[in-house]
């Protein structure tokens, strides 16, 4: 497996997600303190996809350097707070989710097996109901 490649791609995805969360938090704050700038941020975010966080921030640098600095600060603070808990939390949630999916799959497999067995093998002592109705 390519653990290093997967880790790098995961880090990029997490970076973009933390940028999104920072923008969301700042937008909420601005809606209370500076509604005009909150509207501007919303419009900017519609024009520039935040999924590519580095491109998003580079585009914003051309229009609003102060807001970029605020996003960078909030994103870094979020990262510091989240990354402390993340490894253990992710592993725990994946193990729990995998267990739930395996249990569900096993239940479905046993239901399919028992229903196909019921259809092919009549229970002893049961008579064919079509003969009784004649």
From Swiss-Prot:
Cellular location(s): Carboxysome; Cytoplasm
* Coiled coil residues, start to end: none
Q: What induces it?
A: Part of the rbcL-rbcX-rbcS operon.
What changing residue 20 to A/L does, per the record, is: Assembles about 50% RbcL8
User: Which GO cellular component term is one of those annotated?
Assistant: carboxysome
Q: What is the effect of changing residue 17 to A?
A: Assembles about 50% RbcL8
Q: Which domain of life is it from?
A: Bacteria
Q: What is the effect of changing residue 74 to A?
A: Assembles about 50% RbcL8
Effect recorded for residue 32 to A: No longer assembles RbcL8, no active RuBisCO formed
> Result of mutating residue 102 to A?
No longer assembles RbcL8, no active RuBisCO formed
Provide the alphabetized UniProt keywords: Bacterial microcompartment, Carbon dioxide fixation, Carboxysome, Chaperone, Cytoplasm, Photosynthesis
InterPro entries per UniProt: Chaperonin_RbcX_sf, Chaperonin_RcbX, RbcX
Compositionally skewed regions (Polar residues) per UniProt: 111-122
Concerning Pfam families, the annotation shows: RbcX
Gene Ontology molecular function, alphabetical: protein folding chaperone; protein homodimerization activity
Q: Which GO terms describe its biological process?
A: carbon fixation; photosynthesis; ribulose bisphosphate carboxylase complex assembly
Q: Disordered: where is this region?
A: 97-134
Q: Which family does it belong to?
A: Belongs to the RbcX family.
As for what it does, the entry says: An RbcL-specific chaperone. Required for assembly of the RbcL8 core, acting downstream of the major chaperonin (GroEL-GroES). Acts on newly folded RbcL, has a transient dynamic interaction with RbcL and is eventually displaced by RbcS. The central cleft of the RbcX homodimer (RbcX2) binds the C-terminus of an RbcL monomer, stabilizing the C-terminus and probably preventing its reassociation with chaperonin GroEL-ES. At the same time the peripheral region of RbcX2 binds a second RbcL monomer, bridging the RbcL homodimers in the correct orientation.
What is known about its subunit structure? Homodimer (RbcX2). Interacts with the exposed C-terminal peptide of RbcL ('Glu-459-Asp-468'); binds 2 RbcL peptides per RbcX2, stapling them into an RbcL2 dimer. A slightly longer peptide binds with a higher affinity, but no long-term stable interaction with RbcL is detected. Contacts a second RbcL monomer via its peripheral polar surface.
- What information about domains appears in the record's comments? The homodimer has 2 functional domains, a central cleft essential for production of soluble RbcL in which the RbcL peptide binds, and a polar surface which plays a role in correct RbcL subunit arrangement.
Q: Which protein, by its recorded name, is this?
A: RuBisCO chaperone RbcX
Q: Which gene encodes it?
A: rbcX
